[in-house]
Amino acid sequence: MPTITLPDGSKKSFNAAITGQEIAESIGSSLAKAAIAVRIGEKLQDLSDTIACDADVTIITDKDEAGLEIIRHSCAHLLGHALKQLWPQAKMVIGPVIENGFYYDIEADHRFTPEDLAVLEERMQKLAATGYSVKKEWTPVARAREIFHERQEDFKIRLIDDFDADVKEVGLYYHQEYVDMCRGPHVPDMGKIKAFKLTKLSGSYWRGDAQAEALQRIYGVAFRSKKELDDYLTQQAEAEKRDHRKIGKALDLFHLQEEAPGMVFWHAKGWTIYREIENYMRTKLRKYGYQEVQGPQILDRSLWEKSGHWDKFGGNMFTCCIDNHDFAVKPMNCPGHVQIFNQGLKSYRELPIRYAEFGICHRNEPSGTLHGIMRVRRFVQDDGHIFCARNQVRVEIERTCRMVYEVYDDFGFKNVELALSTRPEKRVGSDEIWDEAERGLQEALEAQNLAFRLQPGEGAFYGPKIEFTLKDSLGRRWQCGTVQLDFSMPARLGAEYIDEHGEKQTPVMIHRAILGSLERFIGILIEQYAGNMPVWLSPVQAMIMPITDTHADYVQNVMQKFIAAGIRAEIDLRNEKISYKIREHTLQRVPFLLVAGDREKQSNTLSVRTRDGKELGVMEIATIIEHIRHLIETKSQEIE
């Protein structure tokens, strides 16, 4: 006779075991109609699952984030249902939920095309419109294996074979003639699926292993309503216009090519942006007391084994063998910084010691995940490592957070979200060390009144971390900065200092990156500003154009004045109409377009126009220089 406690504290008693659907019906018909799943304690379950004991119960609808995630997961099953009707020989692999939607990996001889997606989506719409019921059956593992063997679903069988020995049953979901396997929960019927769209195709591999079977991945998005879907698609259309790959090509910033997958060829203009950011960060490093260092590109396997990276990260490392020794190209900079710290015994009076490096890192990311300069194999990280005593941790974390916010503000990101990621299953170090590390980060955030959300299990293998996520002009979120507390690696690599009592102690190591990788951050900036970079970041800050050849000497002299003032100015002496030049440099997103004719030459002035088409009139050269210098020095997002 279970007693159910509802979110408002009210209780309901039942004479026998009861399902989530029956509980919803006992509360009201409208809730029963809207119900998608049920939360029992902390666990989400299907409405058809029975509850035999006393429990805290919440009915989940599409108004809950969990409900929307369930809708998206069920859309993946709907995709499988429709696809097997259209291409019966295809083999279904996995279909998880991702941000805003879902995907399904498929093995098939047929090569899917964008035209196929339209056909597949239409079949999904027809199936969803019937509102058919989804049936769940708990099935013995052996029987589930037989079912998928009969259906020639080889990958489902492999998944079953990977189950732990104590797993006796598996949840099978029946979508009419289609069967899928999942932990669930899922919607009780297709009437709950109201708005979805298939979006793109890509390649993938079984378990992400490039040596395993090649698969095809179909992506989709799903929302609560058609309006939410339409809003999302409108946003995506705007994001498409801002695609950093397209803008990077149009503005001659960089390129990528097959001979160097995941590695960027920086052109002069793109490299100007890169170096401007690097130089800006150096000013912050000096302000906050960092020593800039540089470590080797490759290190012996033995060091990576000591640090724990070989065991936890080995599959993503590029390796080589030299003189019968295994080496790895560094995927991160921290072990190298410990080696620098270890040169000469340190005193507590020297702490904290703050190292920074624009470290070139390489990670063997799967080819299917590479994306422009946002996801690459060779990148530079604005890495920093602070070695300090335990009683200095809180102050250093607070200083680092101030530095992070200062940097983001200068780049125009005002909306920053924080998350505290705690210990993962695979980790190094004792629980006591993790307790202290997690507590240290949380107290530092609370001391600064910084709001954050907890992300259990998402920390690095060597310590918990604070993650800084930027929200851009389209409302998209980009996780960039991290601050990670590490009590483990310094001990593993023999880092020590002498305390005030003359005893050897192991320092605490704080890992921090603000921009993340410079490549990815530049990609974010390009999309944030749609290529219209703030003046201080613009590769060319002013383009000076003579109306005729008779004004060429004048503009050349003017350009030298701009350059002497530290402004990146160029001149366009081509024999083209001035209107043509203005249009071309407007498309190149040059902030200031400066024109010189007879009037300007005689009065030692320039006619000023901005890239957004605003005419600022005729201005004296000194005034223009002063204005542009002010915009550069203040890191202004404006150009007027």
Swiss-Prot record:
PROSITE patterns: AA_TRNA_LIGASE_II, TGS. Pfam families: HGTP_anticodon, TGS, tRNA-synt_2b, tRNA_SAD. It is found in: Cytoplasm. Binds 1 zinc ion per subunit. Keywords: Aminoacyl-tRNA synthetase, ATP-binding, Cytoplasm, Ligase, Metal-binding, Nucleotide-binding, Protein biosynthesis, RNA-binding, tRNA-binding, Zinc. Residues 1-61 form the TGS domain. CDD domains: TGS_ThrRS, ThrRS_anticodon, ThrRS_core. Residues 243-534 are annotated as: Catalytic. Its cofactor is Zn(2+). Its EC number is 6.1.1.3. InterPro entries: aa-tRNA-synt_IIb, aa-tRNA-synth_II, aa-tRNA-synth_II/BPL/LPL, Anticodon-bd, Anticodon-bd_dom_sf, Beta-grasp_dom_sf, TGS, TGS-like. It catalyses: tRNA(Thr) + L-threonine + ATP = L-threonyl-tRNA(Thr) + AMP + diphosphate + H(+). It comes from the Bacteria. GO terms for molecular function: ATP binding; metal ion binding; threonine-tRNA ligase activity; tRNA binding. NCBIfam families: thrS. Homodimer. Catalyzes the attachment of threonine to tRNA(Thr) in a two-step reaction: L-threonine is first activated by ATP to form Thr-AMP and then transferred to the acceptor end of tRNA(Thr). Also edits incorrectly charged L-seryl-tRNA(Thr). Belongs to the class-II aminoacyl-tRNA synthetase family. This is Threonine--tRNA ligase. It comes from Dichelobacter nodosus (strain VCS1703A). The lineage of its organism: Bacteria, Pseudomonadati, Pseudomonadota, Gammaproteobacteria, Cardiobacteriales.
